[in-house]
Amino acid sequence: MKRDELISCFQDTQRISNGTMLRDATERARKSNRVYREVFEAEEVKFCNRTKIIVEENTTFAAAAKYKSFGKTAVLNFANPVNPGGGVVNGAMAQEECLCRSSNLYPCLTDANVFEDYYGYHRRRNDYLSTDRLIYTSNVTVFKTDDALPQMMDREKWFAVDVITCAAPYTANLRIGEEELKRVFRNRVKNIFEAAIDNDVEVLILGAFGCGAFKNPPDIVARAFYEVIQEYEYHTIFKMIVFAIKSTVKGNQTGMCPNIRAFNWCFKKKFSILGDSISTLEGYNPHGYRVFHEGQTCQRTGVSRIENTWWGKVIHALDGELLVNNSWSGSRVTKVPGQRGLFPSGCSDERTGGLHTNNVNPDVILVYLGTNDWAFGADPEEFEAAYNLMLQKLRANYAKSEIWCCTLC
């Protein structure tokens, strides 16, 4: 995309924003501006039964158009903390510039009622970490598409959306530890959520905040969002929280965009498997475990990839992610004859305690055990006792996880 085309597009957007069609709407949006300072907390909170959290490849305004029918919608503008609109006047292409080319947001950001308290404040600080301050603007009008070079939309497709303008840390010029950076993001994210709550937002469009031009690691940013949402129970307040993330994978590149992968890992439902032979797959079970689906067996059975397995199909159908597959070929729920201890039985401490990784617990534990107990004639009372022991240990180790028992009827 040529820079002069982007500059021309932005200039056209400004003419329309301040022209007869939008002058009044732009003025109302300007007057609605409010600067929220650090450590803000909303006083009144309306609770929702359950928040749907979505991670999808999309752009910010396109996601707003898609989900605005579900309730009052606000989007996060990944702001430049010292220059309104970032480099939009010069044809820059980061997220904020795209928003300013498609809407009347820019005149709101340059208005005197927020400039000194937000941009002037950050200019005086001259700090690459920026601050948790933000601007909340109501009813910004989106009238151009969210394409690389926005095009005018038909009038009936125009829509209004609230915009939260907040800057991420700029880490390209910073030396900062991961935990400290996550702490900075946690505080900033909390302020964003509290401002949204204060304005009765029902659908909040977020994204890979600061993971583009500002060079923040997506794993840390995604984790900060996840921890804040869980700790402050924001998943009980909004109807929808949407992470709209533009893919960075171009042309003939393969693999998932790192930003999307990081947010998927945090927010998609995580499954762990506790199973026997049919649940094993070469490369997916702990080192040293007995595996059935490996080598020539994979060729013979046609089970050579995760999408060929029963559990892979279940996880895919439920739009989830595999966390741990703790399956051992030939294992039973009951004690295996000849073994000194319970391991590798399904009721052993090693099996029932090995379904998490890196302090991340599963949302769902899929238990696929019992076939070998039946095949080798395990005593029903012994089986019942072992199964109850297994469930008891799973509940103790993973109190918040759902346990799906797939082989009992």
Which role fits each region the language model picked out?
Residues K270-L274, I278-Y284, Y289, C409:
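Catalytic His-Asp segment of secreted/periplasmic serine-dependent ester chemistry enzymes
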Residues L281-N388:
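Conserved SGNH/GDSL esterase-like catalytic core that processes O-acyl groups on lipids
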Residues S138, D319, V360, A399-K400, ...:
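Proline-centered flexible-loop/turn and helix-kink motifs
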Residues A74, V203, K270, D363-L366, ...:
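Structural motif
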